[in-house]
Amino acid sequence: MLLLPYRSYGTANRLYFIGRVLDNAPLPSPAERGSTLRGLRTMWQRLETDEVPNATVEIGLEGHVTRVTTDAEGYFRINLTPSAPLPWNDGWHPVPLRLVGLPAGVELTGDDAIAATATVLVPPPDAEFGIISDIDDTVVETGATSLPRMFRNTFLREYRQRLPFAGVAEFYRALQVGLNGKRNNPVFYVSSSPWNLYDLLDDYMTHHGLPAGPLLLRDFGIRRANLREGHLDHKLREITQVFETYPTLTFVLIGDSGQRDPVIYREVVRRFPGRVRAIYIRDVEAGLAESKRDAIVTTLAAEIRAEGVPMLLVPDTAAAAAHAVIIGLVTPPAVAEVAIDAAKA
């Protein structure tokens, strides 16, 4: 039995928790290497989950215990208000969880209860801005525009062997540091990948030095609502929730031209006027003649600029960083570090 809390976010007065309960054996660590066959087998085990509905999870927050019940896919989601505003600390708050009940009224007590720790990001009041980034073909090449390449990258290659785009980790760390040097600008990752890949993505981010942040993934369950919700709907919903959680914070949005990121970000700009500092779109066809996809992005960029927000279609991370320093998001020394790493590509 597994109790899997996912990294989430909140404010000093409200915390959002999300996690899942599965009746599966623990999977090998993403750090363990093996044959392609073993990798395929492990990926199948990761995707073929046995969910535990109607399980009871206890959340211990500031001396108070709250119980939440898992849904048909084994997920639990809840917003909690602490008894007093939380201090900032380093931005992350560990919260103890326990799995204390199973379906059919089975209770787990004492040593039988399964424990885990949730971590919740609470940005400080002096954060300069937030960063919201896509993952696939923005941080790491997935090949979402080509099904065979996407299958090969996702299922046949070990995640740790897939290098992030040159300069990405340095650029994201520079944005997190900002101009005040406090490294307290929150980073959020939004992806249409399923929650089943959470441990792989979390390990990947840590291994390659990307700033820690909530990973907002997608439920690929069989419920009708899940089947109806597409790539655009999921991302827009998650980004909207982040914006509404931090109504005084502005954001930098980062994505790619391979899917619907420019369309989603245009809608975000319209819903939240004055809240977007800049948008950087990685050109997945950089170096090629201008394509229909590039033309669409160029048109959208013009529409967004008319709203007062710069949106750039960039060939690489160095180009995004060069613009970011001009508009006061990062420091010149940080841009130099990004350029050095990007030149290694």
Question: Which stretches of residues belong to each language-model region?
Answer:
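A short linear-motif detector with a strong N-terminal bias
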Residues: 35-38, 56-57, 109-112, 168, ...
